Regions:
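Charged DNA-binding/catalytic regions of mobile-element recombinases
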Residues: 1-185
Length: 185
């Protein structure tokens, strides 16, 4: 039953990442609206509607599919994709043509990913991009604060008490970002 829409709404989108050899890789992102949770990502050089359909099924195994799927009108979401989504019992919510602001959480995630990570790293190939994305999503999920989540991360963190002890720096995303924790002396 789909009663609370925000907990059952998922946004998807693609972003293009050039490699050092100017080859284009496409990143498929699935983002939950409730706590801006990055549910799934995958990388391919040749996205098709069939591939995207298989990937959405991979993102939601068994009976974990959301009620609503928000996406743009890109041709990549063709008949094979729509059929797979329908078989999973998901209702599609389409944005208006040329209206990226109607998919704000996915667009914001992609913008943050670019500004905070991809603009500072050279991508060599698909394997290196997967490695980079895995590290960034780990950082995004567990360490990066979000004002809309009251400065918490999508995966909620315990607040450390102010006690005597040294503050240690924990590098993340290959040293691009850092997390700080108190450790007992």
């Amino acid at each position: 039953m789909c009663e609370n829409h925000v907990q059952q709404l998922v946004a998807i989108d693609f972003l293009v990442v050039p490699t050092v050899s100017f080859r284009l890789l496409f990143v498929f992102v699935v983002l939950g609206h409730h706590r801006r949770h990055a549910i799934h990502f995958n990388v391919t050089a040749h996205p098709t509607a069939e591939w995207t359909g298989r990937d959405i099924a991979e993102a939601f195994p068994w009976d974990s599919a959301p009620c609503y799927l928000l996406h743009d009108r890109d041709s990549i979401y063709g008949a094979a994709f729509r059929q797979r989504v329908g078989e999973m019992g998901i209702r599609e919510v389409l944005t208006a043509p040329r209206s990226p602001w109607q998919n704000p959480y996915a667009e914001r995630f992609i913008g943050s990913l670019r500004r905070e990570c991809l603009d500072h790293i050279v991508v060599f190939n698909e394997a290196s991009l997967r490695h980079i994305l895995k590290a960034y999503v780990e950082y995004y999920e567990h360490s990066r604060t979000h004002l809309a989540l009251e400065k918490d991360a999508p995966k909620s963190r315990a607040i450390q008490p102010r006690e005597t002890g040294i503050v240690v720096e924990l590098p993340q995303v290959g040293g691009l970002h850092h997390r700080y924790e108190r450790r007992a002396a």
